[in-house]
């Protein structure tokens, strides 16, 4: 039996079809034949090694996406990235609104906004710690 004839019977890329016990079809295949042997000279070398991981890689045939599909995918990815960046920019703007202004009229960069937020949070934390210490002193002395 030639390789072309063999391919007609066995579906591509399914190593489970190499073993007679795993075939669920009523179709007669060379694998179901009583005369079939893995040592047969007509049996392809790529399948006679037991169907390891290398066989799966060889069997996979990826169809190259069409230029139209690639353009559509790129366009969709660009749109998702635009939305993500827009959301991030809105979040930066909202953060700038709650930070105290240092230079009126100058918009802080993203990096400056994050630095300013960090310093502002540290100052607020120190104020809270100082207030709690003052409360403790008042309660002990009072």
Swiss-Prot record:
Effect after changing residue 95 to F: In e1926; aberrant development of all three cell types forming the male-specific genital sensilla (simple sense organs) known as rays. 81% ray loss. Ray loss phenotype exacerbated on hlh-2 mutant background
Molecular functions (GO terms): DNA-binding transcription factor activity, RNA polymerase II-specific; E-box binding; protein heterodimerization activity; protein homodimerization activity; sequence-specific DNA binding
Top-rank taxon: Eukaryota
PROSITE patterns reported for this sequence: BHLH
InterPro entries registered for this protein in UniProt: bHLH_dom (IPR011598), bHLH_transcription_factors (IPR050359), HLH_DNA-bd_sf (IPR036638)
UniProt note on tissues of expression: Expressed in PVD motor neurons.
Sequence segments annotated as region (Disordered): 30-66
GO cellular component: nucleus
Keyword presence, Nucleus: yes
Record domain bHLH: where: 72-124
Gene3D superfamilies to which the protein is assigned, alphabetical: Helix-loop-helix DNA-binding domain
Function in brief: Probable transcription factor which binds the E box motif 5'-CA[TC][AG]TG-3'. Essential for the specification of the neuroblast cell fate in the development of peripheral sense organs. Its role in the generation of sensory neurons may be through positively regulating the expression of the zinc finger protein ztf-11 during postdeirid neurogenesis. Required for specification of cell fate, acting in concert with lin-32, in the development of the male-specific genital sensilla (simple sense organs) known as rays.
Name of the protein described by the UniProt record: Protein lin-32
Organism: Caenorhabditis elegans
Phylogenetic placement of the source organism: Eukaryota, Metazoa, Ecdysozoa, Nematoda, Chromadorea
Gene: lin-32
């Amino acid at each position: 039996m030639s390789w072309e004839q063999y391919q007609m019977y066995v579906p591509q890329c399914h190593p489970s079809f190499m073993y007679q016990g795993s075939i669920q079809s009523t179709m007669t295949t060379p694998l179901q034949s009583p005369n079939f042997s893995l040592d047969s000279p007509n049996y392809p070398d790529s399948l006679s090694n037991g169907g390891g991981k290398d066989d799966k890689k060889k069997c996979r045939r990826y169809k190259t996406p069409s230029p139209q599909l690639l353009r559509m995918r790129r366009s969709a990815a660009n749109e998702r990235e635009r939305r993500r960046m827009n959301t991030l920019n809105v979040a930066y703007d909202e953060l700038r609104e709650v930070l105290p202004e240092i230079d009126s009229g100058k918009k802080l960069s993203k990096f400056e906004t994050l630095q300013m937020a960090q310093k502002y949070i540290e100052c607020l934390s120190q104020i809270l710690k100082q207030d709690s210490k003052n409360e403790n002193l008042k309660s002990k002395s009072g």
